[in-house]
Amino acid sequence: MHPKQQRESFRSKQYTGTTSGMCDNYLQANMIILPKEYAFEFLLFCQRNPKSCPIIDVLEEGVTTPQIADADIRTDLPKYRIYRNGQLDKEVTDIKDKWRADFVTFLIGCSFTFEKALIENGIRLLHQEQERVVPMYKTNIPCEKAGRFEGNMVVSMRALEPEEIDKAVKITERFETSHGSPVHIGNPEEIGIKDIDNPDYGESISFDKKKRTPVFWACGVTPQNVGLNVKPPIMIAHAPGHMLITDQLEEK
Amino acid sequence: MHPKQQRESFRSKQYTGTTSGMCDNYLQANMIILPKEYAFEFLLFCQRNPKSCPIIDVLEEGVTTPQIADADIRTDLPKYRIYRNGQLDKEVTDIKDKWRADFVTFLIGCSFTFEKALIENGIRLLHQEQERVVPMYKTNIPCEKAGRFEGNMVVSMRALEPEEIDKAVKITERFETSHGSPVHIGNPEEIGIKDIDNPDYGESISFDKKKRTPVFWACGVTPQNVGLNVKPPIMIAHAPGHMLITDQLEEK
């Protein structure tokens, strides 16, 4: 389905599930909406932490149509999360009645893009084969602070065979708007992950620890996580896995 | 002289002239200070126009020491310009008594860095040989707008021999924090420059139009120019050519 049609199916609430695997070749994006009062510090945070927060578009205050998608961001994602004072308030399927003229919207690259490139290059991704959401972990790797925004990096993990790792590094480092090369390879404890089978977000995957090595990439959940630390009166984000599908073709 | 000592000579007002040619190998930066109310839109403008406005550091509100220089930006530049409502108010040698807790400071790459690389690669720069400030021109090339910040690009011009141009492109495209590759080669009129001998900023240089081709690079005067269009109640910048000398070595 073309992105425009797909987004219309969300707008009409025909479909409200995950966007994983939809609209092949089109860039999907994490979305975070904050009141303008927070916008400068958050944009600076993203600029200082490009691996976790690769900015692909910013909608100035009150703007509801991105440059990279002929969409209305208030209705064209399948599911949204509304956070108040750093706590999840509720999940909704549109945010029309929540919209404010001082809202600034940030669109941030996601790993769907580089996963496709890995598979096309013959690298098997176990979470896809096991039909699970990729496992994500809080780490002890500090992000670079910007104003009130500070916290540690969240990473996603893919368990690879040793001979695939070099290739995976080379492939993903090209995707600057999709988290780039891995931030750690091999030892979960070194980056503060105590139990690889107990991810903080997403789902656990089964893999043979003797045959595969865990490889960690910066994850787009980082800015959401750091945003919540600041406890803004309101922050709106896509529900995990329920991304904005853009009209922009993925970089090759 | 080491950057720290050099900056102390500005702080003590022993020297208040241009920083051109000072502290070889250390990065110099354009500086723009705006009230926080403008900071988000200006940062977004820079991010959308990286060739004109390559951000090398941002100092959050009230902060006076950059990450890339052990300096006090209120005293450690040789000369400052204070603009009010889009008009030059005065030139001063420090801004201690003008400082406000809501000031946000932006440091932006400058072309001193790539000029050095050009010379090291055997390319003669006429404005240096003629001891003039590089000629700069307003163009008809629109910048990408961000909020209230909009306007056309300002470019600097270096007249090169035809066989030097390819090399100059290759050298400068590596300097992403120093304006990168040229934005136009050859025809000044095509980018809205009516008289190459009458620059809008800097000084005119003499060159044989039959033997040399004008090559244009995005220029760090662009953000100052665009900033003034917005007519902020106050905006402070370095005086042209009187840059912040940082402690950071230039990229190679």
Curated annotation (Swiss-Prot), chains A, B:
Keywords: Lyase. Signal peptide: none annotated. It holds the Pfam family D-Glu_cyclase. HAMAP family: Hydro_lyase. PANTHER family: D-GLUTAMATE CYCLASE, MITOCHONDRIAL (PTHR32022:SF10). NCBIfam families: PRK05463.1 (NF003969). This is Putative hydro-lyase OB3382. It comes from Oceanobacillus iheyensis (strain DSM 14371 / CIP 107618 / JCM 11309 / KCTC 3954 / HTE831). The lineage of its organism: Bacteria, Bacillati, Bacillota, Bacilli, Bacillales.
